[in-house]
Structure formats: C-alpha cells, structure tokens
C-alpha cells in the first residue's frame, strides 16, 4: 500500500516497484491478510489473526464424459448426524466422519460449461480451517485432541464418501465417468487467494465478530482506505458482502466533496412544493436504533442458549 501524509492511502505498490497513484483505495483482498501484510504492523492487525474464523472447504471440480439428469443445478446432501458434523468442522477443525456436501452442476443452466452430452460438476464439502495461519503443508498440524490435519488423507475420504453417498441415494455412479478433476483444500485456498487460515468465508459470525465488533469498511487511521469482502462489516456471504460494497460506494461518494448518492437521493425524493419539514417522518432514525438494539438482544440470547445447550452434551 502506498501511503502519504497523515497517513492517507495514495495508491498501491506493485511487485515490480511501480506505484499506481489514486485518490482512494478499495481493498478487496482478505482483510486479515491485508492488515498483516499490506499495511504497517499494528496491535490491531495482530489481534485480527486471533479472532474466530469461519470454515473452509474441500472442493472438487469434475469433468464428466456424460450427463446425469438425476442431478439438478443445485443439490444438497445432508448428513444424518448433523451435530457431529458441525463439531468436527468448528471444534476439531477436521472433516466429519459423515460429511454434508453441496453439489452444483453449472451445465444445467449454462450449456457452455461442458461439451455437448457431458456435465461439469462442482462439489463443496465444508471442513475446518487451518489451525495455524503459517501452515504450508498438506500434512497440516495437530489439533488440541492430537488429531492431525492431514489434508491429502481428508481429500481421499471426502471423494470416497461423496461418490458412495450419491450412488446410494440417487442410484448413479459418477466415479467411472470423471475424466478430469481439480481440487481445492484449505492450504490451496490460502496459497491462491491469501485467505487467512484458508477460511473461505473470512471471520466467523460469532458474537464478537458481528455488529460493531466487526472490522469497519473504512480504515480507522488511514484516510481514503476502504475494505470490502467477507471479513469486514456487515458480514460474510455473497448478499451481505454486496451490501458492504454498497456501503463503501456511498461512503466514497459522500466523502468526494459532498457528492450525492444517486440511489439514496432518488429513493428519498420528496416534492418540496407540497411537503414541509413538519410533514416528513422524523422517527426513522429512532427505528433504526431500535432495530439494532433488538438484534443485539437476540444475539445475546442466542449466545446464552448455545452455551446452555452445549452443557447438555
């Protein structure tokens, strides 16, 4: 990151040393990676690395030499013992003995995704994230119970389980028709996209990672620097990340010499000739505060209930 003045984001520095200057910088890289690798070191950046992260995934990308109409565009295969499944992912950071998984067949909606008479298949298996953000090996590191994150072994387990589950539930055999396979694992997610601990959804939505606790879309100390993505406000998931991008675009427009935000101005347009200030609804800001207070109370109740239910095991 190229910084200037007091400090202010003034552009970016490329690997070859070239500086691309800018009035403002929007960073869509992984937020934790950005704070710890693209910006000056701070205690806040270090603390971000210690926050709870979301899950990762083992993802298969298969090219099949025939079509399987039994599979629709979107397919979800849930494990019967879902509690054990979640514990393996979020507590042990491993792959469940009976994993749940999602199957997408993009060629159902886009024929160009596969040759005629063939299918393209994407399988996503949620698994735990890397225990150590510095881990570079597919052999991983041991967790607190002593089990090792051996990703090569877990990939084999996942592939075998997926094929067996699909065959038993849909009575089709995919394995013999796979002509090409690519795989992503937590280490490869980390290496390819600099995702901290290989967590594909960034920071988790645990209590101290939501609402006012979640990293802001604008840097607290560096003016002109904004963040979008899963780990910044308001949260993770494509729709929520898009909402965060909308927030950033409004912040930038408002900071640009008071520029108007077109979609806000249009939606809030009123006929000044027939509408006096006394006629306008003034309590909408209060409703917004009430909304956040209710949301906070529900989050506290949910957190307390989760702690109590955990004691029933």
Kindly give the residue locations of the regions a language model identified.
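A conserved FAD-binding loop/helix module that cradles the flavin
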Residues: 230-253
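A glycine-rich dinucleotide-binding beta-alpha-beta segment and adjacent secondary-structure elements
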Residues: 98, 102, 163, 167-234
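Active-site-proximal substrate-binding core of FAD-dependent oxidoreductases
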Residues: 3, 252-293
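Terminal signal-anchor or tail-anchor transmembrane helices
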Residues: 282-313
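C-terminal segments that line or cap access tunnels to active or ligand-binding sites in enzymes
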Residues: 63-187
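Mid-domain catalytic core of redox enzymes
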Residues: 1-115
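Hydrophobic, well-ordered secondary-structure elements that form the walls
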Residues: 26, 62, 123, 162, ...
């Amino acid at each position: 990151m190229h910084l200037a003045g007091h400090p202010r984001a003034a552009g970016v520095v490329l690997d070859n040393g070239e500086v691309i200057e800018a009035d403002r910088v929007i960073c869509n890289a992984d937020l934790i990676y950005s704070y710890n690798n693209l910006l000056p070191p701070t205690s806040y950046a270090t603390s971000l690395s210690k926050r709870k992260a979301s899950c990762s995934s083992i993802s298969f990308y298969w090219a099949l030499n025939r079509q399987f109409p039994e599979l629709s565009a979107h397919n979800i295969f849930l494990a019967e013992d879902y509690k054990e499944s979640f514990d393996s992912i979020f507590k042990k950071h491993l792959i469940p003995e009976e994993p749940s998984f999602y199957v997408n067949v993009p060629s159902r909606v886009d024929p160009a995704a596969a040759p005629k008479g063939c299918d393209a298949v994407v399988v996503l298996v949620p698994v735990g994230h890397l225990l150590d953000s510095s881990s570079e090996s597919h052999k991983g590191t041991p967790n607190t119970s002593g089990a090792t994150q051996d990703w090569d072994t877990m990939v084999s387990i996942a592939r075998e389980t997926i094929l067996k589950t699909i065959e038993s539930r849909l009575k089709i055999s995919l394995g013999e028709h796979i002509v090409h396979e690519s795989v992503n694992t937590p280490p490869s997610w980390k290496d390819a996209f600099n995702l901290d601990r290989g967590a594909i959804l960034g920071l988790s939505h645990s209590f101290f990672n939501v609402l006012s606790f979640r990293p802001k879309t604008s840097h607290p100390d560096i003016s002109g620097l904004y963040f979008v993505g899963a780990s910044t406000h308001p949260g993770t998931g494509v729709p929520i990340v898009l909402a965060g991008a909308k927030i950033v675009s409004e912040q930038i427009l408002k900071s640009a010499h008071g520029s108007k935000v077109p979609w806000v101005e249009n939606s809030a347009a009123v006929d000044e000739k027939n509408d006096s200030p006394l006629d306008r609804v003034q309590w909408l800001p209060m409703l917004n505060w009430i909304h956040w207070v209710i949301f906070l109370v529900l989050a506290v109740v949910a957190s307390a209930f989760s702690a109590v239910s955990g004691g029933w095991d």
